Amino acid sequence: FEYLCYRPLLKRYYEEDSNMRHESAPKPRLTDADYRKDYLSDKIGIQKRLQWTEEKFFVTTEEEPLFDAADVLRFGKDLIVQHGFTTNLKGIDWLKRHYKDHRVHAVNFPGDPYPIHIDATFTPIKEGLIINNPQRRLPKEQRKLFEKNGWEIIDAAQPAHNEPPPLCYSSVWLSMNVLVLDPKTVCVEKSEKYQAEQLDKLGMEVIPIDLRDAYAFGGGLHCSTADVFREGDLKDYFPKQ
């Protein structure tokens, strides 16, 4: 039901702008063929899961295109897409075919045994700066795009909590699930003091938001929002490909 919140906005944009296109991705069938049987069995240990992640062997198969928007980061003309549990290679290929004017880059994070959504792992803060989960670092080979375009990738601060709140299925790394409002302003969960301190030292104005009790509904500040409209011009942040 998330789409119901911003559907009135889309309706307004459609009516105001003759160039606005309202499109939807193909809805997957989600049959048993989309998943590897017993992949999530409790009998499988963490080391095996980390090995599978490094080998890009995930619970989802390549039966049909699958992707979640929360696995995608948009940097102007470039889409950075996490290949993992909720986005497969066919899903990434669908994005490439559909958005021909954009460059689509697949990334993965070997340190995450359950790679679901990118925004508690890899978070752009402002032009030229990204914080990366220190337990799920972007592989060296995949850093080249960022490095040759002058982007710095630094470790995110440690979470303030040792475990998530009751009924929350996300990790403690929702600490870095922040909401950037503009190049100087960022919203951080009120109790995440270490992440707030790091961003303050990086020159950001930090706005504390009390949201931890809502984590059980599916995530943090970034998870709770959808940027349906962005102000400004379309910029090429990675001219050196």
Question: Which residues are covered by each model-predicted region?
Answer:
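The feature marks the mature, well-folded catalytic cores of soluble enzymes
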Residues: 1-241
